[in-house]
């Protein structure tokens, strides 16, 4: 692959990312679709920052709508998203909408929405379980 092709692909990816960021700011809608991972956590946290603190506008901001469909994932990343949502709710409402399935780590993210603004679809499955951990092997 030549450097020119790589530069063109990077430029196209950058333009697409900028377009998505711009549209996201206008419609104030985010989504967590799939597993809660470090990459998705980073995207959601940065999105929340862009729609609140970094937007350059003064609070109160228009509400943010967050769609969630996940089997769960990393508890550490979930708590990062939860903490940022808690901070963002000081400046605007966050409307959470469960679609399809909201399970495990996704349930706390769904519950982190503004009271009275948390919804699930008619056919959405929600599952929560106790947290446990363990280790195996010699110490």
Map each language-model feature to its residues:
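Terminal-region recognition feature
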Residues: 1-139
